[in-house]
């Protein structure tokens, strides 16, 4: 079975399912989204700018915690509707958690908005800078209290090598909490591969990787903890699958990366 380990909710849902069919992908793990670039009339800067501006505000951490929390409640409902409409295609999802809450309020949020919905992980987390990456520590602690739910953390720009190393330190201090290094660390992919190699609870996400070389090296170093993902609508399922099949060192690794690994991680 081929499972995309990260797709954001796309509208209409029927179009998202059609993309899975085109790529020969059986299932996808869903993540929430605030912007919807797939709704732009054309792929021009003019049409896509408004949706991408929302994304850049999130990545830049310019929203206060209250505003972001309020947004998350609505997009969780949007994701829940997609899962209910196609339970055989979207069998699992990660629930968003605001960064910047203290531990008791983070725990309360996870109980109310993640566990109640049956979501299997926490994220995507998008630290706006290296300092905000430290807030992941609280989430990791809460994860330990709530069944060791995996964390999915964005490690591409604006996160730097320093932020990635901070996340590696958090993985070391919480060895029983799976931490997915989203987008493979971007430009700092070599550091990220080394961290994942040295921490058995760390995982390497192959969506939006820096280059085919980074995918090839990751699958050679940590084939059992690499995850096929598209980050759709920002990535394309057909192209993302082809990247894995082209750069994988063996058919056995290809099978693991395209599905077996995420099945084992999320127990789906």
Where are the regions a protein language model picked out?
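Mid-to-C-terminal alpha-helical segments outside catalytic/metal-binding sites
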Residues: 1-3, 15-27, 31, 225, ...
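Acidic-and-aromatic substrate-binding clefts and catalytic sites of carbohydrate-active enzymes
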Residues: 6-14, 36-39, 68-71, 98-105, ...
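An N-terminally biased module of ancient metal coordination in phosphate/nucleic-acid-related enzymes
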Residues: 1-74
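Active-site neighborhood of phospho(di)ester-bond hydrolases with catalytic His/Asp-centered motifs
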Residues: 2-5, 29-32, 94-95, 123, ...
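Active-site gating/metal-coordination segments in enzymes
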Residues: 51-152, 158
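Alpha-helical scaffolding within the catalytic cores
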Residues: 14-15, 74-79, 105-110, 163-167, ...
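Conserved, mostly hydrophobic/aromatic
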Residues: 6, 20, 79, 83, ...
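Catalytic pocket-lining loop regions of alpha/beta-barrel enzymes
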Residues: 119-121, 128-129, 133-227
């Amino acid at each position: 079975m081929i499972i995309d380990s990260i797709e954001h909710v796309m509208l209409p849902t029927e179009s998202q399912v059609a993309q899975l069919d085109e790529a020969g992908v059986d299932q996808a793990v869903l993540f929430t989204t605030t912007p919807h670039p797939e709704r732009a009339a054309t792929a021009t800067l003019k049409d896509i700018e408004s949706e991408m501006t929302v994304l850049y505000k999130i990545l830049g951490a310019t929203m206060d915690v209250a505003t972001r929390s309020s947004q998350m409640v609505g997009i969780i409902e949007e994701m829940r509707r997609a899962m209910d409409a196609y339970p055989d295609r979207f069998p699992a999802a990660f629930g968003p958690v605001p960064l910047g809450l203290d531990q008791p309020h983070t725990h309360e949020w996870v109980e109310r908005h993640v566990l109640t919905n049956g979501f299997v992980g926490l994220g995507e987390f998008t630290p706006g800078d290296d300092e905000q990456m430290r807030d992941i520590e609280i989430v990791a602690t809460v994860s330990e209290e709530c069944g060791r739910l995996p964390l999915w953390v964005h490690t591409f720009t604006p996160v730097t090598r320093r932020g990635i190393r901070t996340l590696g330190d958090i993985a070391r201090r919480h060895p029983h909490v799976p931490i997915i290094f989203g987008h493979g660390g971007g430009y700092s992919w070599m550091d990220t591969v080394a961290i994942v190699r040295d921490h058995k609870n760390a995982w390497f996400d192959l969506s939006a990787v820096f280059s085919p070389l980074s995918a090839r090296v990751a699958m050679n170093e940590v084939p059992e903890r690499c995850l096929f993902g598209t980050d759709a609508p920002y990535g394309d399922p057909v192209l993302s699958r082809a990247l894995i099949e082209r750069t994988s060192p063996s058919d056995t690794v290809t099978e693991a990366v395209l599905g077996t690994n995420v099945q084992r991680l999320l127990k789906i």
